[in-house]
Amino acid sequence: MILGITGGVGAGKSSVLAILEKEYNAKLILADEVGRELMQPGEANYVNIVNAFGKEILNEDQTIDTKKLAATAFSNPLETLRLNAITHPNVRVRIEWMIKEIRDKEPDALIVIEAALLSEGHLIPLCDDVWYIYTDEQTRIKRIMESRGYSQERCLQTIARQKSDAQFRAECRVVIDNSHSIEETKAQIERHMKKYR
């Protein structure tokens, strides 16, 4: 079974992934990590990103400075679309390869793909089910401020750049409310996991 996990920044996707890994022996595939790997020199997306955004985004050692790339790529929606058009196809190909690797070793493994942009990355067709990890905005702001040291204003800007709650809900069949205690989140996960047995 392949489960897709999505949600906005500060929703607590990591805590849900930790539960799935520990309690259900899930094999995790994190799209952001795959994307970062593919930006390394010699990897599939490196040259195209440098050609698109210029050598100004490079560190002295010729690796991509992700902060400089983010500042450029997220400066306006067209630049974001350009970055996504470069990165998403190869991320999907690498994820398909990772799924095959896992299935070759453990045919019955629970595989979990985590991505904020599951639909934009064309990853939903790979999934048997898709969960949206929901958390109320105030809890998200608190978490982002604690984990990233952002101001409240920067948190709100970050949240505003992402998909809305309604957009996430439209893409997913299951909503996990992660606004409360970890026990409540675990109970919801258990309830939904029972359906797959």
Mark where each language-model region is.
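Hydrophobic anchor at the beta1->P-loop junction of P-loop NTPases
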Residues: 5
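Small-molecule kinase domains that catalyze NTP-dependent phosphoryl transfer to phosphate-bearing small molecules
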Residues: 95, 124-125, 146, 150-197
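Walker A/P-loop
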Residues: 14
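ATP-dependent small-molecule kinase phosphotransfer cores
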Residues: 36-109
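Short beta-strand-centered segment that lines the nucleotide-binding/catalytic pocket of NTP-utilizing
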Residues: 26-39
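ATP-binding Walker
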Residues: 11
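ATP-dependent NMP and nucleoside kinases share a basic, alpha-helical "lid"
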Residues: 96-105, 111-146
